Amino acid sequence: MLSMAVQPNINAIAKPSIYQSPKLSLKPFKTPAFANPKPFFSSPSFSQLKKKNNWSLFVAPETISDVAIMGNEVDIDDDLLVNKEKLKVLVKPMDKPRLVLKFIWMEKNIGLALDQTIPGHGTVPLSPYYFWPRKDAWEELKVLLENKPWISQKQMIILLNQATDIINLWQQSGGNLAS
């Protein structure tokens, strides 16, 4: 329920209302539907401001049943002024970015690299390819993971175990993918 105080002003009948509602109009009315306001503050600066502001409320006779006059206040139902609809927004939670171990399987080498996969956006390379047996790819990958403080110890162990498994598979096959 909205509670407001209004001040009578004969000149305001010709002015347009700031509240546009199908039930409120500028038609002449038989029963006055306004009252004198009471100041909220008694400071001198507020009393100067209230002299400049004149408020008026216009109500058509067919809507007087929706308006209740009580003392110096006019109460108007909320649905008279604004019809609000509640909108619901469904937000799908984003998947967390993942760390992915990529590899290139070649006859004489195997390359290992680390990427970050961001769901809905693609991948971000976090390292170049480290090749084994030319260099120790596993050791280079371990140093890279240790230099990234945002990668947890658990993730680091999982990625290094995956790298070990891939290197072992490559060694067992002798670089030949068909065997």
Swiss-Prot record:
Role noted for this protein: Component of the chloroplast ribosome (chloro-ribosome), a dedicated translation machinery responsible for the synthesis of chloroplast genome-encoded proteins, including proteins of the transcription and translation machinery and components of the photosynthetic apparatus.
One GO term of the biological process aspect: translation
Homology family: Belongs to the chloroplast-specific ribosomal protein cS23 family.
Localization per Swiss-Prot or TrEMBL: Plastid, Chloroplast
Subunit description: Component of the chloroplast small ribosomal subunit (SSU). Mature 70S chloroplast ribosomes of higher plants consist of a small (30S) and a large (50S) subunit. The 30S small subunit contains 1 molecule of ribosomal RNA (16S rRNA) and 24 different proteins. The 50S large subunit contains 3 rRNA molecules (23S, 5S and 4.5S rRNA) and 33 different proteins.
Any one Gene Ontology cellular component term annotated for this protein: chloroplast
Protein name: Small ribosomal subunit protein cS23
Extent of the transit peptide: 1-58
GO terms of molecular function: rRNA binding; structural constituent of ribosome
